[in-house]
Amino acid sequence: MVEMRMKKCPKCGLYTLKEICPKCGEKTVIPKPPKFSLEDRWGKYRRMLKRALKNKNKAE
């Protein structure tokens, strides 16, 4: 039975279901998901931007 998992070419970044990349011929790999963390590293900056935009809109 054929495994139907998305694969990614490490050379050109193309996603496919094939073992070999149809674009460049490189062997594809199953990409790992990004690390998950409950700690929001960029939340502080998002909140600062949100406040700055809110204050800018009030000034107009």
From Swiss-Prot:
GO terms for cellular component: ribonucleoprotein complex. GO terms for molecular function: snoRNA binding. Keywords: Ribonucleoprotein, Ribosome biogenesis, rRNA processing. It comes from the Archaea. It holds the Pfam family Nop10p. Gene3D superfamilies: H/ACA ribonucleoprotein complex, subunit Nop10. GO terms for biological process: pseudouridine synthesis; rRNA processing. InterPro entries: H/ACA_rnp_Nop10, H/ACA_rnp_Nop10_sf, Nop10_arc-typ. Belongs to the NOP10 family. Involved in ribosome biogenesis; more specifically in 18S rRNA pseudouridylation and in cleavage of pre-rRNA. This is Ribosome biogenesis protein Nop10. It comes from Methanocaldococcus jannaschii (strain ATCC 43067 / DSM 2661 / JAL-1 / JCM 10045 / NBRC 100440). The lineage of its organism: Archaea, Methanobacteriati, Methanobacteriota, Methanomada group, Methanococci. The gene is nop10.
